[in-house]
Amino acid sequence: MSTNHRPQLESKRGKVIKIKDTIQHARGLPQQTSIKYRQDIKNEKTINKFDDLQKHDNNKITSLESISPPTKKLKIESTKEITTEPLNQEIDKQSKLSLKNDDQSDIQPNEKSESDEEDSKDEEDDESSDDDDSDDDDTALLLKEIENIRREKEKQNSDSTNNSINNSLTLQTHDSSTKKKSWRSSTTFNNKSKKESTNDRNNNYTTDTLNSQHHQKFMSKYIR
């Protein structure tokens, strides 16, 4: 990357510059014009700054507290009319009603309990007989299913053994009859080379020009 877009520093231009530019580089400017005091050591300036900040925060809090949320108008409900009857009469009426209800509730459960017990006994007897019959049927069905599963497993095992025997026999016959040919025999270049080799024995063809038949004939005819 090039840095031609950046202004050149004075250290590269030299000490004496005849034409001064208005451009000032950030590195040439003063970096810090004010003194920074340590905050962990208490000085007059740091204490005054802290007090000012604390006062400012307190003023904000008080201003926020002074602002009250908008109040809703409450509707005043009309007062109910006060009854003139004394409280003692009402209490007596309630106690009498409760006693009557208790007496009726004690009589009715006793009659119901006897009838419920008889009905429950009859229902239990019927349910027990039905459960026994259903259990017998379930056991018979389970035994049948178990027998069917066993038969299926035996068939699968016999089929697998037969298949393995047949496969082994077929492999033996294939090995004895024919052997696998290599992939090289099916290639075109291999077949061509064999054909050419048989022809070369008869023609004595060579790529060497000195040992070729044509060259030897030429030499014997015109030179020797």
Swiss-Prot record:
One of its GO terms (biological process) is mRNA splicing, via spliceosome. Residues 1-37, 52-224 are annotated as: Disordered. Involved in pre-mRNA splicing. It comes from the Eukaryota. Disulfide bonds: none annotated. Associated with the spliceosome. Residues 7-24, 74-83, 90-113, 144-157 have a biased composition (Basic and acidic residues). The keyword Nucleus applies. Keywords: mRNA processing, mRNA splicing, Nucleus, Spliceosome. This is Pre-mRNA-splicing factor CWC15. It comes from Candida albicans (strain SC5314 / ATCC MYA-2876). InterPro entries: Cwf_Cwc_15. Residues 214-224 have a biased composition (Basic residues). GO terms for cellular component: catalytic step 2 spliceosome; nucleus. Belongs to the CWC15 family. GO terms for molecular function: RNA binding. Residues 60-69 have a biased composition (Polar residues). Its main location: nucleus. Residues 114-139 have a biased composition (Acidic residues). The lineage of its organism: Eukaryota, Fungi, Dikarya, Ascomycota, Saccharomycotina. It is found in: Nucleus.
